[in-house]
């Protein structure tokens, strides 16, 4: 599968948090998140392993009991079923990959 860059395809996950599925295959799904300064991703978990890379901005990411100040170029891996949350310190862009594929993030 090949996906051309486009400004279309974003959907609101929460106020100030936009998601776009970039590409997906049989085992992984890649997303782009646009994150607005001052917003929170509440503590949650899911069965998917989640790896990410911060393209721009600044977020505070809590994975389990550990908190990380995430800056551009930093990356992370969150095992499936582990609680995590994020505070958006500056307007940010993050790329995240989920495995297995998250059916709720597939384009309609």
Please annotate each region the language model reported.
Residues 31-45:
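Conserved short histidine dyad/triad with adjacent acidic residue
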Residues 48-59, 64:
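Glycine- and acidic-residue-biased ligand/ion/polar-headgroup-sensing regions
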Residues 55-56, 71-72, 90:
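A cytosolic small-molecule/anion-sensing beta-strand core signal
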Residues 58-60, 67, 83, 92-93:
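Structural motif
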Residues 80-104:
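Ligand-binding loop in jelly-roll beta-barrel domains
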């Amino acid at each position: 599968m090949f996906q051309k860059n486009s400004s279309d395809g974003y959907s609101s996950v929460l106020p100030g948090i936009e998601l776009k599925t970039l590409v997906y295959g049989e085992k992984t799904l890649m997303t782009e998140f646009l994150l607005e300064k001052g917003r929170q991703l509440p503590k949650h978990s899911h069965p998917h392993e989640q790896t990410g890379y911060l393209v721009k901005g600044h977020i505070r990411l809590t994975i389990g009991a550990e908190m990380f100040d995430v800056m551009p170029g930093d990356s992370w891996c969150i095992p499936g079923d582990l609680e995590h949350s994020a505070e958006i310190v500056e307007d940010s862009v993050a790329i995240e990959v989920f495995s297995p594929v998250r059916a709720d993030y597939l384009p309609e």
